[in-house]
């Protein structure tokens, strides 16, 4: 495998030593839904291919393989803190600690925390003053479950201040592509989201379309993150499925886009 191509995720105000990115598919091999770079073990890909992708990423970033902290892709709103206690665990205990986790928060330098997404919104956060970074997988379940609220609260418990937090949303499915059933609209209604902001109906089909980016922007604002500290990628994973993986377009058994963040010091 050659070098991995990244979509760099920029914060409004760059933070020295902090870097965030999303992977792209690389050189797509015909109809292979896992081609070329896939870091997710739980989507039916050959484990050796996933391992090769992870090794390539670690080498390219100049980290050891065990410095990549990646939970299995889960549609949850739970958050794990990666600290020295976690790092001291054996591999099985580390895996158990990340089971069912949808977001990671850390103050540690020298590690990459990241998540895999198929179409959901990957969100990286940083408080440069407190030295705290985070990453979240905000699919529709995680979004409706208030994953961003949980992440910001966890960051603040570690010493972050909401006014100092910056957030960047990476490549994800756009509203036009994200057609959903009414049961998903109901889930957002029950969670008290403003449906006038996040839902529109297709005039021809009557089907609902949800704007996950807008929903998570509202969640960031509600959590106290200033609007001026939020950036949003306009890349759509479904429209650009030749560049980013899309479970909606390619099927559940396909690769995932990896979004990571790390700090060097």
Predicted regions and their residues:
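Active-site microenvironment for binding and transforming phosphate-containing groups
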Residues: 1-265
């Amino acid at each position: 495998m050659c070098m991995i191509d990244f979509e760099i995720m920029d914060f409004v105000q760059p933070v020295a030593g902090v870097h965030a990115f999303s992977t792209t598919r690389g050189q797509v091999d015909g109809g292979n839904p896992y081609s070329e770079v896939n870091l997710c073990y739980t989507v039916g890909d050959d484990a050796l291919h996933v391992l090769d992708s992870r090794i390539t990423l670690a080498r390219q970033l100049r980290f050891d393989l065990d410095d990549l902290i990646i939970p299995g892709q889960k549609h949850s709103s739970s958050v794990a803190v990666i600290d020295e206690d976690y790092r001291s665990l054996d591999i099985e205990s580390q895996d158990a600690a990340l089971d069912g986790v949808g977001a990671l928060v850390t103050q540690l330098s020298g590690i990459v925390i990241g998540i895999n997404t198929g179409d959901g919104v990957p969100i990286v956060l940083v408080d440069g003053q407190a030295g705290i970074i985070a990453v979240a997988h905000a699919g529709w379940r995680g979004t409706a479950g208030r994953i961003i609220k949980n992440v910001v609260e966890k960051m603040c418990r570690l010493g972050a201040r909401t006014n100092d937090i910056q957030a960047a949303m990476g490549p994800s499915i756009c509203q036009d592509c994200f057609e959903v059933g009414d049961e998903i609209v109901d889930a957002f209604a029950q969670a008290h989201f403003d449906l006038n902001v996040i839902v529109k109906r297709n005039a021809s089909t009557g089907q609902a379309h949800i704007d996950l980016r807008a929903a998570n922007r509202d969640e960031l604002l509600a959590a106290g993150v200033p609007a001026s500290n939020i950036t949003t990628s306009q890349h759509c994973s479904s429209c650009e499925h030749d560049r980013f993986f899309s479970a909606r377009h390619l099927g559940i058994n396909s690769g995932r886009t990896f979004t990571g963040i790390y700090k060097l010091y």
